[in-house]
């Protein structure tokens, strides 16, 4: 996988209460990823960017909600979420990996 694709696969971390609990208890981290990204691409991107070993990747497609606006009904975009489980002994620290 080329370097450009690595940066396009991971769009950013998904921050929520569930994601925080998973990160602290099971060393699983949640990312927003490109809708066309595969599990293997996500695994390689996380390993390349954060220098960790990935044990498992689980993905799901999140359907965009329909919202009512002044101009009628609108729809938020669909997006893809990935749960990345690290191998035992590995830890991912967003602050130190950004440097």
UniProtKB/Swiss-Prot annotation:
Signal sequence bounds? none
| BP term (GO), one | translation
This protein is called Large ribosomal subunit protein uL23
- Quote the function comment for this protein: One of the early assembly proteins it binds 23S rRNA. One of the proteins that surrounds the polypeptide exit tunnel on the outside of the ribosome. Forms the main docking site for trigger factor binding to the ribosome.
One GO cellular-component annotation of the UniProt record comes to: ribonucleoprotein complex
Q: Which InterPro entries match?
A: Nucleotide-bd_a/b_plait_sf (IPR012677), Ribosomal_uL23-like (IPR013025), Ribosomal_uL23/eL15/eS24_sf (IPR012678)
Q: How does it assemble?
A: Part of the 50S ribosomal subunit. Contacts protein L29, and trigger factor when it is bound to the ribosome.
Q: Which family does it belong to?
A: Belongs to the universal ribosomal protein uL23 family.
User: What molecular functions are annotated in GO for this chain?
Assistant: rRNA binding; structural constituent of ribosome
Keywords annotated in UniProt: Ribonucleoprotein, Ribosomal protein, RNA-binding, rRNA-binding
Q: Which organism is it from?
A: Azotobacter vinelandii (strain DJ / ATCC BAA-1303)
């Amino acid at each position: 996988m080329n370097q450009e694709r690595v940066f396009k696969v991971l769009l950013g971390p998904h921050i929520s209460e569930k994601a925080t609990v998973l990160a602290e208890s099971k060393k699983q981290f949640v990312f927003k990823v490109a809708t066309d990204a595969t599990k293997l691409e996500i695994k390689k991107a996380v390993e390349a960017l954060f220098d960790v070993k990935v044990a498992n990747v689980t993905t799901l497609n999140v359907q965009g909600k329909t919202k009512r606006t002044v101009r009628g009904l609108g729809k938020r975009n669909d997006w893809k979420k990935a749960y990345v489980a690290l191998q035992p002994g590995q830890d991912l620290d967003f602050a130190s990996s950004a440097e």
